[in-house]
Amino acid sequence: MIDFGNFYSLIAKNHLSHWLETLPAQIANWQREQQHGLFKQWSNAVEFLPEIKPYRLDLLHSVTAESEEPLSTGQIKRIETLMRNLMPWRKGPFSLYGVNIDTEWRSDWKWDRVLPHLSDLTGRTILDVGCGSGYHMWRMIGAGAHLAVGIDPTQLFLCQFEAVRKLLGNDQRAHLIPLGIEQLPALKAFDTVFSMGVLYHRRSPLEHLWQLKDQLVNEGELVLETLVIDGDENTVLVPGDRYAQMRNVYFIPSALALKNWLKKCGFVDIRIVDVCVTTTEEQRRTEWMVTESLSDFLDPHDPSKTVEGYPAPKRAVLIARKP
């Protein structure tokens, strides 16, 4: 059973303590009524992983853990088998004692695009909304963050995160809470809030921006990464049934329109710091994610378009401040 007691004890002593007014009851309800049918199988994989304290831990340049002496072939095989029980692995990569988890996404590439534009993360308390397996949280810790809290309701991601955490020596500087942002009170407690790859899944994108703002301290920084299309400040794509085979894509604005949305929600110092086309080198099928990926979602005769005829995925990073 995944235990949240360490997180409760941690935030009881800091400026997130008011979250304890609602969080334990929400988690208890989740444990009692909302667990996925495969959750026990996934959590067993975490439980059966060996307890290892890394001799060398690199979170600054990658997520890599190594032992002082090489593990035996049997130990490596055990780790690999248990981690494969948690497939598909979408966000990474991870290198853990000789087991290299080549995830669908090269999330390290996204981090390399984002990092140069951030305020110094040293000592910061960070919220990562829609954090997936938690890859970027570990990179935030590597960049000096004091605490990284991720929220994501996908329970497989929780188990992937806990598996990686265990292999990183049960590191308590990052925590994943299996809730969506709409389940959080207005904590107003995080120095930096990340929302990467979430906005286009929201039926009400402006409401999402308000929710992000409600989590920030005054003068806190928002890092927003999402799908965009080319166009002026009035350009927004509203896809039909699917976009790149995804059913739950609602609004894809231009970067300039998104800048206006942020302004409308009261953010200031808004910057578009990166815009790039998603390539099939950055998102692709691997032996750790064997189902369809980006190449299957693009027009085989014109990769500048999705199979539905929309512009192929392009992503922008915007940074803004809550006054």
Curated annotation (Swiss-Prot):
It comes from the Bacteria. One of its GO terms (biological process) is tRNA wobble uridine modification. Its EC number is 2.5.1.-. Transmembrane segments: none annotated. GO terms for molecular function: transferase activity, transferring alkyl or aryl (other than methyl) groups. It holds the Pfam family Methyltransf_9. The keyword Amino-acid biosynthesis does not apply. It catalyses: carboxy-S-adenosyl-L-methionine + 5-hydroxyuridine(34) in tRNA = 5-carboxymethoxyuridine(34) in tRNA + S-adenosyl-L-homocysteine + H(+). The keyword tRNA processing applies. Catalyzes carboxymethyl transfer from carboxy-S-adenosyl-L-methionine (Cx-SAM) to 5-hydroxyuridine (ho5U) to form 5-carboxymethoxyuridine (cmo5U) at position 34 in tRNAs. This is tRNA U34 carboxymethyltransferase. The lineage of its organism: Bacteria, Pseudomonadati, Pseudomonadota, Gammaproteobacteria, Enterobacterales.
